């Protein structure tokens, strides 16, 4: 059977992983699915992608979290995105 490969932006996993930490700093922030996705999308657009090659059907162990500098960048991008979404959520308050 042919191997089916695909690309995965590993940065996406990192951003989702840090999202809850950033939200924990801001009790007033909306935590609905729409806002969470908006925050992650905005943050990802500020961050460089980190693509890895994956093979369909293969279970991969989680890559080690990015180095401290990258974490700081992700944290900053998420914090900015959170403020943007808070100012203009795409739904009624
Ligand atoms: Zn919301």
What feature does the model see in each segment?
Residues 2-93:
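Charged, amphipathic alpha-helical regulatory modules used
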């Amino acid at each position: 059977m042919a191997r089916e490969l695909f690309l995965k932006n590993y940065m996406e996993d990192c951003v989702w992983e840090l999202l809850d930490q950033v939200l924990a700093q801001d009790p007033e922030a909306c935590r609905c699915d729409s806002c969470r996705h908006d925050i992650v999308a905005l943050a990802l657009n500020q961050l460089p992608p980190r693509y890895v090659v994956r093979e369909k059907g293969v279970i991969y162990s989680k890559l080690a979290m990015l180095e401290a500098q990258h974490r700081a960048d992700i944290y900053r991008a998420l914090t900015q995105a959170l403020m943007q979404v808070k100012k203009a959520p795409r739904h009624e308050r």
